[in-house]
Amino acid sequence: AEVAPAPAAAAPAKAPKKKAAAKPKKSGPAVGELAGKAVAASKERSGVSLAALKKSLAAGGYDVEKNNSRVKIAVKSLVTKGTLVETKGTGASGSFKLNKKAVEAKKPAKKAAAPKAKKVAAKKPAAAKKPKKVAAKKAVAAKKSPKKAKKPATPKKAAKSPKKATKAAKPKAAKPKKAAKSPKKVKKPAAAKK
C-alpha cells in the first residue's frame, strides 16, 4: 500500500513541468532555430560540442536544464534534416557544424525567387508603354476567363484621353464584333438546311 501512492505523486509533479516548458516556447523562437544560430555563430573549425551549445543557449536566456531533452531532440532533427553536420560522436552527443552545402542551396533558391518577382514588375511598365499590346492581351484574357471581363472597362477610360490608346481600343473593339458575327453566320446556314 505504501508503494502505490509514490508513482501517483510523481505523475502530477511531471505535468506542471511540461506546462511550464511549453509557455516560453510560444513567446520565443524554437529550440532548433536557437541551436542553429548558436552553431552558426561559433568559429571553431572542429564544430560545437553539445555542452558548448547548451552554454550558448543558456547565455541567450534559454532554460537548458528544464528543456535538456528538447535541445537533444532539436539537434538530432537538425542533423537528420541536413542543416547541421556531425563532426564527432554519434547522436546528440558530439560536435556539430553548419552544413554549408545546405545553407548555400537555400540561398540560390531565394535569389532565384527574387528575380522572378523583378521580371513580373518589369513587364508591367513595358506594357504601359505599348498600349496596343496591352489591349490585345486584355482581349485574349477576356475571352479565356469570364472573371477578367471587368478589365475591358479600363481601356475605354484610356481611350478618352490619349489618341494612341483610341487606336489600340478600335482594333480591340473590332475583334469581339468579329467573334460575335461568326456564330451568327454559323446559325444562318443551319437554319437554311432545315
Swiss-Prot record:
CDD domains: H15 (cd00073). GO terms for cellular component: nucleosome; nucleus. One of its GO terms (molecular function) is structural constituent of chromatin. Residues 1-14 have a biased composition (Low complexity). Pfam families: Linker_histone (PF00538). Residues 15-26, 116-194 have a biased composition (Basic residues). InterPro entries: H1/H5 (IPR005819), Histone_H1/H5_H15 (IPR005818), WH-like_DNA-bd_sf (IPR036388), WH_DNA-bd_sf (IPR036390). Residues 27-100 form the H15 domain. It comes from the Eukaryota. Keywords: Acetylation, Chromosome, DNA-binding, Nucleus, Phosphoprotein. It is found in: Nucleus; Chromosome. The modification Phosphoserine is found at S145, S161, S182. The modification N-acetylalanine is found at A1. Residues 1-31, 105-194 are annotated as: Disordered. One of its GO terms (biological process) is nucleosome assembly. Belongs to the histone H1/H5 family. Histones H1 are necessary for the condensation of nucleosome chains into higher-order structures. This is Histone H1. The lineage of its organism: Eukaryota, Metazoa, Chordata, Craniata, Vertebrata.
